Amino acid sequence: MSTLQELQENITAHEQQLVTARQKLKDAEKAVEVDPDDVNKSTLQSRRAAVSTLETKLGELKRQLADLVAAQKLATKPVDPTGLEPDDHLKEKSSLRYGNVLDVNSIDLEEPSGQTADWKAIGAYILGFAIPIILKALYMLSTRGRQTVKDNKGTRIRFKDDSSFEEVNGIRKPKHLYVSMPTAQSTMKAEEITPGRFRTIACGLFPAQVKARNIISPVMGVIGFGFFVKDWMDRIEEFLAAECPFLPKPKVASEAFMSTNKMYFLNRQRQVNESKVQDIIDLIDHAETESATLFTEIATPHSVWVFACAPDRCPPTALYVAGVPELGAFFSILQDMRNTIMASKSVGTAEEKLKKKSAFYQSYLRRTQSMGIQLDQKIIILYMLSWGKEAVNHFHLGDDMDPELRQLAQSLIDTKVKEISNQEPLKL
């Protein structure tokens, strides 16, 4: 740790730099007022950034100085024979040792938590871009998502494409698409776009384009999404025409429609219409005037594609279509089922196997319901009864080798290992 004198010298030096930087900022502001060209504007931005950086650094140094002074005061105090810290409220020492001091200075309580994203602002921002850059960014954050997040964690990245530009004084300038790649400790602003929020809004606004380009997240690929959507219209129409176990059977054959899943969905649509939120209605209205490909009922060729890139909640543009939020919940249960199967067949202790299980459904449910709508569990049951068995049979379980071929190869491995060593052969 720096000594008291070093910190004081550092603070003095930064204060001098800050005075100079503020003077340069004033000069830059005057220059922009006189001649507002790109060079002067760029200089002004860099001057502002320099002042902001110096102010942040100076504040940090002053906090360090205060901490150091406080630590020195504590060090000079006689050690309490009970082992208690001077400001601990306990009268007797706890059985737990003292741990880390967590500095919460950087946390801003005015900022909302992740569940309260401003979808209206996020949607308006995304709709201001050309479709090619949105789809390319979606590809990078879904199909190549794991690598993109790993390479850029803790930063705010910018996507750039020739299709996205703005003209300033007749000059074309790139229009960057900003996405924040948070760490577990990051606090996100309501209008800030994270990979999860981006996948949610992009899939919700442009499902037809996602379908046309067949952009599928690996997380959805392994639960057989590609197979599931292949004959989607036949599948959903057959499902809607089927008899619903949650409706009373009609007394006369002419009223058979009254007991179908279609009728249950019509009743559900009436319930959903009563729980609409104004911000999301405004977003849908704005999207309809732009190039978005929205839909009003689940029996639409591209409706299922809002989940192709595994958004972490139901997209707001599809939230008020009966059966769609529940369809997303069905997919999240399939992800949990596949991970449970993978954990069950893996080698390891019960604790290690439990760690491999997932909670996609709980996360999806919590995030979607925080948008102001309660999921109808009966619809999820209907999906599971109709499609669950078929979906599980099309899971990709990472075991494509024929059992007989595996057994033959394993016997050859066992024989060779025993010939050259006395170690136990591993399983293929």
Curated annotation (Swiss-Prot):
- Write out the ranges of the annotated region (Viral panhandle binding): 1-175
Region Involved in the inhibition of IFN induction: what ranges? 252-296
Give all Phosphoserine modified positions.
386
Q: Which organism encodes this protein?
A: Andes orthohantavirus (ANDV)
Annotated region (Interaction with host UBE2I/UBC9), positions in chain: 188-191
Motif YxxL: where? 178-181
Pfam families per record:
Hanta_nucleocap (PF00846)
Which compartment or compartments is the protein found in? Virion; Host cytoplasm, Host perinuclear region; Host Golgi apparatus, Host cis-Golgi network
The impact of changing residue 46 to N is:
In strain: CHI-7913
What is the designated name of this protein?
Nucleoprotein
Protein's UniProt keywords contain RNA-binding: yes
